[in-house]
């Protein structure tokens, strides 16, 4: 991750919103360079670390919070839960998300795991921690990314625009106080360990659209190719 100004890396709105933590982003770049110097790799690839912030801040209407990137090489792309179009098989959490997508909306199974079309409609796919050591989940938790992503969430709330936050799992649910009066959909995480405890049947996609409509906002077209 190069030491470049945020204005060269992210959407202009996000560059302004993240200005209070720009020095923290730079420190995380130093942390990642130290990881490489020590013989450790990190995911996702440098250009994708801040990818969630390349979509316009002012257009965000749904926030889906993940924990940290997929630790499997080739999976993490900088958007929570998403993978590149050529990834097979899908990560099991994403496979469960697609099972609920089909059950909730009645759409056919997507042809691949790329969730970029959601981002293009104002769905922000944000991990609380933006990097991970390959093969070691949560390895970069507590290293400093949380200050950056919490600043981002506060910026979303401060807009006072209609937004729905989708919080999957206990880790994501700890953000609820920060969301103030934002509409929130909570359920267990879609991972195989917890999906059957309330993620399946939670209808997050249709419920998000209902909550957006109640607030006078356009619904999301969740259909994926």
Curated annotation (Swiss-Prot):
The gene is ung. This is Uracil-DNA glycosylase. The active site is at 68 (proton acceptor). It is an enzyme of class 3 (hydrolase). InterPro entries: UDG_fam1, Ura-DNA_Glyclase_AS, Uracil-DNA_glycosylase-like, Uracil-DNA_glycosylase-like_sf. GO terms for cellular component: cytoplasm. One of its GO terms (molecular function) is uracil DNA N-glycosylase activity. Excises uracil residues from the DNA which can arise as a result of misincorporation of dUMP residues by DNA polymerase or due to deamination of cytosine.
């Amino acid at each position: 991750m190069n030491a470049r100004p945020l204005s060269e890396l992210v959407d202009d709105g996000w560059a302004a919103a993240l200005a209070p933590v720009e020095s923290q982003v730079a420190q995380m770049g130093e942390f990642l360079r130290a990881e490489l110097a020590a013989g450790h790799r990190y995911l996702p690839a440098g250009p994708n670390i801040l990818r969630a912030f390349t979509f316009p801040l002012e257009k965000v209407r749904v926030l889906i919070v993940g924990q940290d990137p997929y630790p499997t090489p080739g999976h993490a792309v900088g958007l929570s839960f998403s993978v590149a179009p050529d990834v097979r098989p899908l990560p099991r959490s994403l496979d469960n998300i697609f099972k609920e997508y089909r059950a909730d909306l009645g759409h056919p199974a997507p042809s691949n795991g790329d969730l970029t079309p959601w981002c293009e409609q104002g769905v922000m796919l944000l991990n609380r921690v933006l990097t991970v050591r390959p093969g070691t989940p949560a390895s970069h938790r507590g290293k400093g990314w949380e200050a950056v992503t919490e600043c981002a969430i506060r910026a979303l709330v401060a807009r006072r625009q209609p937004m729905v936050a989708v919080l999957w799992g206990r880790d994501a649910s700890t953000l609820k106080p920060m969301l103030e009066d934002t509409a929130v959909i909570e359920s267990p995480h879609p991972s195989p360990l917890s999906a059957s405890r309330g993620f399946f049947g939670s209808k997050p996609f249709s419920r998000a659209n209902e909550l957006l409509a109640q607030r006078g906002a356009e619904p999301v077209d969740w259909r994926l190719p």
